[in-house]
């Protein structure tokens, strides 16, 4: 899937701009062995649903087809939800939890033929999907960035529409999308990693695919984006996985693709700098994995993704 987006991206020499060494801390990744699991896939959509206190996973790509199955994880096992209505099959969509409406919002993606711009709501209490018909919507894109902004709403930024990377920003208002116009926005990109630090009330964005250098770190406080000056930062990656981990008091970034080589390094954004986290055991390198933080389920979890052509369906938990 990432190759579809790399087509128009200028990615040469980006890797060289990342620093090699930083202050380090130790963590541990622990593999979880659920009774059942979704089939191997990458570029799935995954988040924590606060309403049901479970992780929700939707769709992805299994190497031959795009998927539209829905799964929930309760900390012990993955369970497939037999929803009578569900979003059409896709990969590289994104989902995020809206604290205002207490719904999970799904937007965008790619189905093998076209870029998608439909919006769906997931109700974790009823286990039902509902399609919305907003008057205004973000452009149809693959690889958008969806995140719960510091005000509790779901925001959407960027993505790739088949011709251009986007730099527009939108917010879900409960019944439709409203375009936002911050004074400054990150350079246009898709497949960046985004996590929201709920202690500092700021979103953190790193990397992605772009026509202009995406090897940079941006923060968003609910009103303004700020480009951070960092002496040390992770290797440039696209389709990395990021989430805020309160145990570490930092946004954690794991894996991602980098110039055709998938990664399995773990980094933490502390609020002012990146710090590499070292572990004695780490998951396989991967891009397009799902990530979510769920304190009730054991902390930060990752699932699936792909290491080169190897599709994965393993589940891991981060232990600080």
Give the location of each predicted region.
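Bacterial N-terminal signal peptides that target proteins for export
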Residues: 1-10
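Bacterial N-terminal signal peptides
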Residues: 9-18
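Kelch-like beta-propeller repeat domains
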Residues: 22-320
């Amino acid at each position: 899937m990432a190759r579809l987006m790399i087509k128009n991206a200028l990615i040469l020499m980006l890797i060289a701009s990342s620093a090699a060494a930083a202050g380090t801390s130790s963590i541990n990744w622990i593999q979880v062995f659920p009774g059942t699991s979704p089939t191997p896939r990458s570029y799935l959509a995954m988040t924590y649903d606060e309403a049901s206190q479970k992780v929700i996973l939707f769709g992805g790509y299994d190497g031959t087809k795009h998927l539209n199955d829905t799964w929930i994880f309760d900390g012990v096992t993955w369970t497939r939800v037999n929803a009578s209505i569900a979003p059409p099959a896709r990969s590289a969509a994104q989902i995020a939890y809206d604290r205002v409406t207490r719904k999970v919002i799904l937007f965008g993606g790619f189905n093998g033929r076209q870029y998608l711009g439909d919006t769906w709501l997931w109700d974790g209490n009823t286990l039902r999907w509902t399609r919305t018909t907003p008057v205004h919507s973000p452009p149809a894109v693959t690889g958008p960035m969806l995140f719960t902004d510091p005000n509790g709403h779901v925001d959407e930024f960027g993505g790739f529409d088949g011709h251009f990377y986007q730099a527009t920003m939108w917010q879900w208002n409960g019944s439709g999308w409203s375009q936002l116009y911050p004074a400054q926005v990150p350079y246009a990109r898709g497949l960046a990693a985004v996590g929201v630090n709920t202690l500092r009330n700021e979103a953190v964005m790193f990397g992605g695919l772009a026509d202009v250098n995406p090897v940079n770190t941006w923060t968003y406080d609910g009103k303004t984006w700020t480009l951070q000056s960092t002496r040390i930062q992770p290797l440039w990656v696209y389709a990395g996985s990021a989430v805020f981990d309160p145990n570490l008091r930092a946004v954690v970034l794991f894996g991602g693709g980098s110039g055709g080589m998938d990664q399995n390094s773990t980094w933490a954004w502390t609020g002012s700098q990146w710090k590499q986290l070292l572990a004695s055991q780490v998951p396989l390198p991967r891009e397009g994995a799902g990530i979510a933080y769920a304190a009730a389920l054991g902390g930060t979890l990752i699932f699936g993704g792909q290491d080169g052509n190897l599709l994965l369906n393993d589940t891991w938990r981060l232990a600080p």
